C-alpha cells in the first residue's frame, strides 16, 4: 500500500530564524536579570496584559464560575479518563534491579519529581486538552507540586476553562 498525501505543505525558505533566536535570547537574559518585574513588562508589551501572573484562590473560583456546567462535565470526563489511564500506566512500570555479570548491576526505579511545570497553549487558541493531559498525568505520577502556565488572551488573561482544568 502506498501512502497518498491529501495535503502537503510547500517547502519555504527559512526567514528571520537568526533574528528570532537573538530576540528570544535577549528576552530570556532580561528576564533572568529583571525577574518577575521584567516578565510583567513583557506580558504588558506583548499581550496587553497587566493582571496577576500567579492566579489567586479567588481568581480560581471566579474562573470556575465562568465555565458552563456542560464544559465542566466534559473536562471532568476527559480528566478522569486521562488520569485513569496514566495511573494504569504507572502500575505497569515496575522497579527492578538485575546483576548482569558479577558486580555489574542495572535496573530502574520510578521516583516522582517534586514539581512539574505544565505548559498549556493559550492566547488566541486555548488548548484545554493540553491542561487535561499534562496536569492529570503529573498528578497520576505522584508529583506533589504541579504548576500550569498559560499565556493570557490579549487584555483578558488566561482562559477560565484552563484555570478551572489546572485546578482539578
Which residues does each predicted region cover?
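Conserved small-residue-rich beta-alpha loop and adjacent elements
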Residues: 98-164
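Conserved protein kinase catalytic domain
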Residues: 43, 163-166
Amino acid at each position: 500500500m502506498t501512502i497518498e498525501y491529501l495535503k502537503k505543505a510547500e517547502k519555504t525558505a527559512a526567514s528571520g530564524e537568526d533574528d528570532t533566536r537573538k530576540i528570544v535570547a535577549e528576552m530570556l537574559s532580561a528576564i533572568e536579570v529583571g525577574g518577575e518585574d521584567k516578565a510583567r513588562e513583557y506580558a504588558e508589551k506583548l499581550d496587553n496584559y497587566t493582571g496577576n501572573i500567579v492566579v489567586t484562590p479567588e481568581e480560581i473560583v471566579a474562573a470556575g464560575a465562568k465555565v458552563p456546567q456542560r464544559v465542566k462535565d466534559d473536562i471532568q470526563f476527559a480528566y478522569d479518563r486521562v488520569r485513569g489511564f496514566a495511573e494504569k500506566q504507572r502500575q505497569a512500570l515496575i522497579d527492578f534491579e538485575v546483576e548482569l555479570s558479577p558486580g555489574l548491576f542495572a535496573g530502574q526505579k520510578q521516583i516522582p519529581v517534586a514539581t512539574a511545570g505544565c505548559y498549556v497553549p493559550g492566547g488566541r487558541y486555548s488548548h484545554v486538552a493540553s491542561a487535561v493531559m499534562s496536569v492529570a498525568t503529573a498528578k497520576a505520577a505522584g508529583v506533589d507540586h504541579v504548576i500550569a502556565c498559560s499565556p493570557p488572551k490579549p487584555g483578558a488573561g488566561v482562559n477560565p476553562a484552563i484555570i478551572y482544568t489546572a485546578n482539578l
